[in-house]
């Protein structure tokens, strides 16, 4: 993901991104988001839902451990989010974002599909044509 979009998510969700500026000996999140810009909206929406849920539940006197991203990357053509904290709701939101990435172009965010052979990437028709079966 571009440094600009990475920074935007860090600013909007500082609690989720608490490990973003730590070193490689402490977290894989130090490398940033390891995927294309097309999944930005999926992540932004998921992070907004996760943080608002945690804030709402904690305000009501219950306690949910803060979700903290440990690594976010493309793996086998889909978004993969490693994290700690949360509950079944936050887990469901993050799994839904991962599943939606299987149908979203990693480069531009348009509807997409995984390529049939080669390095698995989920791309729209335009980006499949641009890159071929990479």
Located regions from the model:
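Interaction interfaces in information-processing and related assembly proteins
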Residues: 3-7, 11-92
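Residue-level signal for secondary-structure boundary elements
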Residues: 54-58, 62, 102-106, 132
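Short, flexible, mixed-charge glycine/proline-rich loop motifs
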Residues: 73, 92-103, 114-118
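Short leucine-rich amphipathic alpha-helical surface patches
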Residues: 83-85, 101, 112
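Short cysteine-rich clusters marking metal-coordination/redox-active sites
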Residues: 105-108, 124
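Basic (Lys/Arg-enriched) interaction patch that binds polyanionic ligands
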Residues: 109-112, 121
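Short functional micro-motifs and their immediate structural scaffolds
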Residues: 111-114, 129-132
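Cysteine-rich micro-motifs
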Residues: 118-130
């Amino acid at each position: 993901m571009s440094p600009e979009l990475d920074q935007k998510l860090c600013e909007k969700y500082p609690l989720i991104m608490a490990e973003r500026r730590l070193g490689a000996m402490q977290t894989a999140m130090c490398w940033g988001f390891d995927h294309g810009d097309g999944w930005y909206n999926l992540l932004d929406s998921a992070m907004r839902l996760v943080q608002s849920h945690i804030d709402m539940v904690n305000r009501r006197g219950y306690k949910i451990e803060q979700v903290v991203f440990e690594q976010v990357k493309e793996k086998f053509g889909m978004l993969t989010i490693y994290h700690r904290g949360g509950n079944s709701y936050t887990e469901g939101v993050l799994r839904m974002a991962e599943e939606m990435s299987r149908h979203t172009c990693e480069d531009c965010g348009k509807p997409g599909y995984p390529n049939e052979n080669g390095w698995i990437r989920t791309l729209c028709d335009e980006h499949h044509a641009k890159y071929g079966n990479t």
